[in-house]
């Protein structure tokens, strides 16, 4: 499979700490509840993609952590949430980050809590250059046949450190299939079983790629 343009999304992480004021759970009016503020923040952050990002663009904001307290009868001082953001375009990535910061600041003011927000950019989006992608398409078609090459399928919301190479030089990230057998699972899956029959296709592809590239140089 070969993409012209975005292939894999960026992978960013964020953490937010909500500091309130602990109190006995039977007397919540004596404190500032960070759990309540955190729950409202989780819901509010879901509006970032839904109401800030152009529907024709793609972005994901997933909350994956919520930690607060360890007793049934105590409102804790602090709640912590965290998660991940995925996007393909740098401007969408920045837009999501800024919207999250704005919501965190406003939510702290609304509940009288102190909300700290930290956004950490990870792998950038993996974006193929068109010329190199079309070159790779031709080579793949020579090796496997045109019907075996998927062109511009839906990109992945995963992440890939090859993106750093593509920021420095034009290039192309390609996918090599594992075949239709039982071992064909998604990435990071314990049931994945590499199909040795795919090796000759991979080797032939890279050899042909070098031959064609040097011939055109």
Please provide the spans of the model-predicted regions.
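Fold-level recognition of mixed alpha/beta catalytic cores in primary-metabolism enzymes, strongest
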Residues: 1-43
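Metal-dependent amide/peptide-bond hydrolase catalytic core
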Residues: 36-217
């Amino acid at each position: 499979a070969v993409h012209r343009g975005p292939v894999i999304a960026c992978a960013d992480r964020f953490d937010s700490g909500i500091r309130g004021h602990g109190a006995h759970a039977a007397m919540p009016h004596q404190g500032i509840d960070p759990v309540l503020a955190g729950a409202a923040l989780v819901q509010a952050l879901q509006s970032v993609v839904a109401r800030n990002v152009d529907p024709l663009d793609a972005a994901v904001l997933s909350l994956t952590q919520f930690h607060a307290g360890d007793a049934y009868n105590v409102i804790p001082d602090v709640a912590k949430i965290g998660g991940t953001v995925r996007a393909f375009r740098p401007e969408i990535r920045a837009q999501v980050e800024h919207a999250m910061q704005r919501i965190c600041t406003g939510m702290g003011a609304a509940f009288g809590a102190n909300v700290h927000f930290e956004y950490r950019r990870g792998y950038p989006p993996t974006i193929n250059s068109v010329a190199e992608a079309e070159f790779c398409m031709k080579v793949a078609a020579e090796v496997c046949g045109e019907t075996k090459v998927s062109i511009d399928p839906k990109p992945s919301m995963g992440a890939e450190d090859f993106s750093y190479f593509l920021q420095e030089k034009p290039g192309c990230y390609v996918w090599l299939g594992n075949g239709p057998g039982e071992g064909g699972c998604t990435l990071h899956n314990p049931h994945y079983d590499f199909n040795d029959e795919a090796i000759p296709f991979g080797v032939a592809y890279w050899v042909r790629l070098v031959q064609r590239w040097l011939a055109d140089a």
